[in-house]
Each structure stands twice: as structure tokens, then as C-alpha cells.
A protein has these predicted regions:
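Extracellular hydrolytic enzyme modules, especially secreted metalloproteases
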Residues: 5-12, 316
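Beta-strand elements of repeat-based all-beta scaffolds
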Residues: 1-3, 18-27, 36-41, 47-603
Length: 603
């Protein structure tokens, strides 16, 4: 760690001692350099009236390339509102930039400001469009609007997703009233633009017990007015979190789930929605009597039950179990809460000590050159055919706790110069990785083998075959992957302003090119195979407001359309070749009927 003192300014007289740099070392020095992060602080603010430090208006986190003289590789810029005591710490913008200051991603936040007057549990809010300044007032500064932008190094960004929030005010307590979302860049900071869906929420409470903000009605509607979801809830409002019933509206009915509780607030019964025969599956839960918080028995409507007991209360782990088929198994735990062994029904019946056992060596050995013997763990699988020779897996970790090598028992069959095949018991050692200055795998080597006599010794050797080499961009996305045969796959990232989408273009070693358009919700809008023998092959995908796939159009213009009900269950598929296939469901979600186009013709 390195610290520095910021330059005194009018906003922050006297400056501030801050962390200037952080260098981390994984302890293994032949697999990549150390990682160094530097920090820069701007626009510090001390409130003279409150005599309190409000924070820095801008914090820049710089990732330094320790393989290139600690030059700046990328930087994350965070902006904060430090205008006054009430808004301190609110993040107004974040961005990721390359060394030249070119943005790749950005998030913008906007907030509302209200003075808050409380008369007991009765709140009154007064909107403020200027800075909040008061010696006596309380304030409410909720997040109103968030926008995510994709730049990919260009000067202007494309809005890939937006969210807008509205809150209950006078007579309420600042609960979220509605939420709008758009991945088309059309919503706007005032929330009056087009949106994909909007969620409206209603609440209940119990003022006599100071319980508020229990959501009882949630409605999700699309920008076109379509009703997607409607869920209601009931509570025992004598308690803060006792939801007793959830009802989901379906197109032709509703799905009801009920809950019951004990005096400790534990769920003791859950009853699922009815199936097509009106039967409701239920589960009953019984808790151990010592702490009254760990489930020791589960019964269901079919008469099945499972049990667990002999709890290690230090860690809340059950050491004895019985499953639905009346089979028993046991778990061993050490003094640090780690599982050391598991025995199943066969092991308990035959007296075998374990089916799987775990050993831990958490202490690494250090020398002048770093870690000489990494920490490791051993997983042993009991082999009934070789009782004295377990199947072992050894996992080594570096100083970050990152798995850097795995050894497994194995058999290699070899033949040379016409000799017959020969089986050799070996340890199969995972290929070594070489990391870049930012902890990413830059080189991945093939696995190797070694004798069985050094299972717990870290194998430092690298395979002689050329490794797989990966190059990344500043967002840690692979831009080039070169295999040992020197074949290379490249990936380029751009943005499409028209569809507000990220375009990922992959070119393989044979120069085949495919572009994929992805919207701000992570859904694929379009794929284009650009190197087909007959020209481009394009497949497009369309979604409804809550990102359910409703339409697929192939390169010939053939359309496959899907329809859903309010339970997100697909009720109809219209395929250009097979026609219309329709489905009906019971309230529990079981398929009741399926009708294909051929069956429909037959009546």
C-alpha cells in the first residue's frame, strides 16, 4: 500500500491522506507480473458549516501495466455528488476509459431531492430543485434515472438501457411506486418517453407496529399497454415479514401459493398452486429445538419425508441425513467448518470410512522468490476395487486463492516402436497459465503428466507445445485467441446506433465471419453469417417488453412466432413448416394439453 497527501484546495483546506497505489502479488512469480492499481482524487469537499468531510467529487482508479513500465492501461472514473451533506456519496456517473481517455462504457445517475417532515410515522415531502441547505431538516434523495451507455472508444456513446423510478411521497414513506425500463434509448431523464415495460407497486403496513413498505400488488405492463404480470400478496401484518399468500394472475385463472409460520418466524408449511385436478402439493418444515432455525425434517403431501440432525451449531451444518428413500448418509466437519468426509448408505453398511474425503493444507511456504509450496486441498474418492489406493484430486491455489493447478489420478496408455500398449499410472497435471498484468489468462499451456510420488508438490513445469495465447481489450473481452497451431480467431466490438445494440464480430481461422447484435438487456437481436457461399445469412430475433422471444425470422423471411400467457408459459408456437402448436397448462405450470397443426385438422 502507498499513501499520499492531496493538494489543499478551497473546497478541501488542508488536503487529505489517501491511498495512492495498491500492488498485489499472488506469490507465484513465474506465471505473470504483479498487479498495480493507482488512485487519483479530485474535487474534495469539506462542509465548513457541518465541519465534516463529504468526500471527493471524482475518483480515478488506474490499472497500470507493470509489464510496460507502469504505464496506464485503463482507468475507471467515478463521479460523486459532494454539493451538500444530504447528497454526499451519491454516484452521479461512472465510466471505463482506455489510457487515452476514450470511453468504452458509462453509467449516468440522476437523483431527486426532497425535504422531509415527519410527524411520528406520517411523512411529508417537499421537492427541492436546488441544493439542500438546512440546520434542522431531514432530506430524501432517491435515485430517479439511470442510463447505461456503450462507447467502444468512439466519441459519442449509444444508450443501451435506461431505468426511471417514481416514489410514493406524502402519506407514505418513500417506497418505490413505479419503475420503467427501456433498452432502446427512448425513455429519457423525465421518464416520459417510450418504455419496454413499467412496474407499478402498491404497499400495505401496520402503523400501530411501525411496519411499512410491504408490497401487496405488483403490475407489469408493456409500453403498448399489454398486461404482462399481475401478482398480489397477503401478510400477517403483526410481523415485519410474514407473507401468507402470493397470487399470480393467469389468463384464465390464478396461481395461489400459501405460507404458514411458527412463533419464531420460520416457514412451517408451503402450499403450491393447484394442479389440473385441484390437488395442491404442500411441504411442511420442522426445525431443531436447540436454535429453532435449522430445518431438521421436511414432509410433503405424498407422505415422503427427509430428515437431518446432529447439527454442528458453530456453522449450522447437519452431520446426519436421511433422504426420501430412507437412506442415510453422514458428513464430517472440522473445527473450521470445512467438510472433511461424506459417507453414503453403502459406506455406512460396509464400514468404509468415506465415499469422499477432503484434506486441507491452507498454509503456503515462502522463500525469497515468493511462494515455494502453494496451499492446496486434496479430494479423495474411495475406490472399492482398490481400497488402499484412493482416486485423488489435488488443487493448488496462489496467494489470491485462485486455483492455479489441478492434479488427478489417471492412467496413460502408450505404445512405441511396435510394442504393445502399456498402461501407466500417473498424475495428470493441468496446464499452467500465465497471467497478464491485470490477472487475465494470457497464455494457457497443455496438461502434462508426472509420477504418482509427488502428488502434494506443485509442478512448476510448462508443456513444450506452444500455448493458447489470448489478447484482451480494456473491458477484459477476448479480442484475439491464437491456438498452438497458430490458427487465430479475432473478435471486434462496435455499436449500432440504430438498434442501440452491441455488435460482436467474430472472424475464425478460416476467415468465416459472423456478427451478433445484442441489446442492452443481453438478448440477441440479430446474427449475420457474412461469409456464406450464397452471401449473408441473417437471422433476426424480436422480443416483447419483458424480453420474451416472440418472433424469429430467418434469412428467407420465414417467421416463427410465439405467444405467452401471464405466467410466462408459451401457449402457442407458429412454425412455418409445422404450423401452429398450442399448449394449455394448469395453475401449477404442468402441461395439460398439446395440439399440433395435424391434430387440429383431425378435430
Amino acid at each position: 500500500l502507498d499513501y499520499a497527501h492531496t493538494t489543499p484546495t478551497y473546497g478541501l483546506p488542508g488536503g487529505k491522506w489517501v491511498m495512492a497505489a495498491l500492488t498485489v502479488d499472488d506469490g507465484i512469480h513465474d506465471d505473470g507480473p504483479v498487479m498495480t492499481t493507482a488512485f487519483e482524487y479530485k474535487d474534495g469537499k469539506r462542509d465548513r458549516h457541518e465541519r465534516e468531510f463529504l468526500g471527493f467529487g471524482e475518483v480515478i482508479t488506474k490499472n497500470l501495466d507493470t509489464e510496460k513500465g507502469n504505464s496506464v492501461y485503463r482507468q475507471a472514473v467515478e463521479n460523486y455528488d459532494v454539493a451538500n451533506y444530504y447528497t454526499q456519496g451519491n454516484v452521479t456517473a461512472t465510466s471505463v476509459e482506455d489510457a487515452n481517455g476514450n470511453k468504452y462504457t458509462e453509467t449516468k445517475n440522476r437523483y431527486d431531492s426532497y425535504y422531509l417532515t415527519a410527524d411520528g410515522d406520517k411523512y411529508t415531502f417537499a421537492k427541492r430543485d436546488v441544493n439542500l441547505w438546512s440546520d434542522r431538516a431531514s432530506a430524501f434523495v432517491p435515485l430517479r434515472y439511470t442510463a447505461n451507455l456503450q462507447y467502444e472508444g468512439a466519441a459519442n456513446g449509444v444508450v443501451t438501457s435506461e431505468a426511471w423510478n417514481e416514489y410514493y411521497l406524502n402519506g407514505y414513506h418513500g417506497e418505490l411506486k413505479s419503475y420503467k425500463y427501456s433498452d432502446k434509448g427512448s425513455l429519457g431523464e423525465d421518464g416520459n418517453g417510450k418504455f419496454d415495460y413499467a412496474t407499478a407497486i402498491k404497499y400495505t403496513g401496520n402503523a400501530s407496529k411501525h411496519i411499512f413498505g410491504l408490497p401487496v400488488d405488483v403490475t407489469v405492463t408493456g409500453g403498448d399497454g399489454s398486461l404482462y404480470h399481475h401478482v398480489t400478496a397477503k401478510y400477517n401484518t403483526n410481523y415485519a415479514n410474514h407473507i401468507t399468500q402470493i397470487t399470480q394472475q393467469l389468463n384464465d385463472g390464478e396461481a395461489v401459493t400459501d405460507y404458514k409460520y411458527d412463533s419464531y418466524g420460520n416457514i412451517i408449511q408451503k402450499t403450491l398452486p393447484a394442479n389440473g385436478k385441484g390437488q395442491r402439493m404442500w411441504y411442511k418444515y420442522r426445525y431443531e429445538p436447540e436454535m429453532n432455525m435449522y430445518v431438521e425434517r421436511i414432509d410433503d403431501a405424498w407422505g415422503y419425508r427427509s430428515e437431518q440432525g446432529n447439527f454442528d451449531y458453530r456453522y449450522g451444518i447437519a452431520k446426519e441425513h436421511r433422504d426420501l428413500n430412507n437412506f442415510y448418509y453422514e458428513t464430517d466437519v472440522d473445527d473450521l467448518g470445512r467438510i472433511t468426509g461424506v459417507r453414503g448408505p453403502n459406506e455406512l453398511a460396509t464400514g468404509v470410512p468415506y465415499a469422499i474425503a477432503f484434506e486441507y493444507q491452507p498454509l503456503a511456504t515462502f522463500g525469497e522468490s515468493g511462494i515455494t509450496a502453494p496451499a492446496y486441498a486434496v479430494t479423495k474418492h474411495y475406490d472399492i476395487q482398490h481400497p488402499n489406493d484412493d482416486l485423488e484430486t489435488v488443487t493448488f491455489v496462489d496467494g489470491f486463492g485462485r486455483a492455479v493447478q489441478v492434479k488427478k489420478d489417471g492412467v496413460v496408455t502408450s505404445a512405441s516402436k511396435g510394442n504393445s500398449a502399456k498402461d501407466e499410472n500417473v498424475m495428470i497435471v493441468s496446464g499452467r497459465n500465465v497471467y497478464d498484468a491485470f490477472g487475465r489468462v494470457a497464455k494457457a499451456f497443455y496438461p502434462t503428466t508426472e509420477g504418482t510420488g509427488s502428488k502434494s508438490t506443485f509442478n512448476k513445469s510448462f508443456d513444450n507445445v506452444s500455448p493458447t495465447v489470448t489478447v484482451y481489450d480494456v473491458l477484459d473481452r477476448a479480442t484475439s485467441v491464437t491456438l498452438p497451431d497458430n490458427s487465430t480467431t479475432t473478435t471486434a466490438y462496435t455499436v449500432d446506433n440504430g438498434s442501440h445494440a452491441l455488435v460482436t464480430t467474430v472472424t475464425d481461422a478460416l476467415h468465416n465471419v459472423q456478427a451478433t447484435h445484442t441489446n442492452g438487456s443481453g438478448k440477441t437481436l440479430k446474427t449475420i453469417q457474412k461469409s456464406g457461399p450464397d452471401g449473408e445469412i441473417t437471422t433476426s430475433f424480436e422480443y416483447d417488453g419483458i424480453q420474451r422471444l416472440v418472433r424469429v425470422t430467418d434469412t428467407e423471411g420465414n417467421v416463427t412466432a410465439s405467444t405467452y400467457d401471464m405466467g410466462d408459459r408459451r401457449t402457442e408456437v407458429n412454425h412455418p413448416a409445422s404450423g401452429i402448436t398450442s399448449f394449455t397448462y394448469d395453475a401449477l405450470g404442468n402441461v395439460q394439453t398439446k395440439q399440433t397443426a395435424n391434430l387440429a385438422k383431425e378435430g
